[in-house]
């Protein structure tokens, strides 16, 4: 798998704290504290374990509102989440993910990998990402 991945998180409106803006754990290496915690889609035990570890390790959590027009660019190793939207208005966001030419799907995708098959169709774990939905924007060219 590659670590050459970045996501642009683009809200379509202002996102106040009550709406659940994108939230980050800092520093970037914070993911290492929780990378072995097993994801559970049926309850909140995963979230509780993450919260407990970050508290014990004194990991800083950055939660700030987004103004209209602001964009977040974040690395795939940056531990992030979007808290619950406590308003009656939908939180509308476009997330575009970009990765290096030659990137591969991780060999063992998990529930936390999300619905990756929807976004990288016709590609199996361990294979180079190559599908009609994932065009090469800037190909790597062998240089002498």
Residue ranges: model-predicted function:
Residues 5-14, 41-51, 58-62, 106-116, ...:
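Low-complexity, flexible helical/coil segments
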Residues 39, 71-73, 77-144:
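Non-heme Fe(II)/2-oxoglutarate
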Residues 15-79:
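Double-stranded beta-helix
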Residues 2, 11, 27-30, 84, ...:
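Short capping/connector residues at structural and topological boundaries
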Residues 1-17, 65-68, 73, 96-101:
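Short, conserved beta-strand element in jelly-roll/cupin
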Residues 3, 13-16, 57, 70, ...:
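Residue-level signal for the start and early helices of compact helical domains
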Residues 5, 20, 91:
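Conserved catalytic motifs of the protein kinase core domain
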């Amino acid at each position: 798998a590659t670590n050459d991945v970045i996501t642009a998180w683009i809200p379509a409106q202002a996102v106040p704290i009550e709406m659940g803006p994108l939230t980050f754990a800092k520093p970037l290496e914070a993911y290492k504290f929780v990378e072995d915690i097993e994801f559970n889609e049926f309850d909140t035990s995963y979230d509780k374990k993450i919260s407990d570890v970050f508290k014990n390790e004194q990991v800083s959590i950055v939660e700030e509102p987004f103004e209209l027009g602001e964009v977040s660019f974040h690395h795939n190793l940056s531990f992030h989440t979007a808290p619950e939207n406590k308003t009656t208005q939908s939180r509308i966001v476009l997330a575009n993910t970009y990765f290096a030419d030659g990137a591969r799907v991780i060999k063992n995708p998990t529930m936390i990998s999300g619905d990756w098959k929807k976004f990288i169709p016709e590609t199996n774990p361990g294979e180079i990402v190559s599908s009609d939905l994932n065009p090469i924007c800037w190909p790597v060219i062998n240089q002498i």
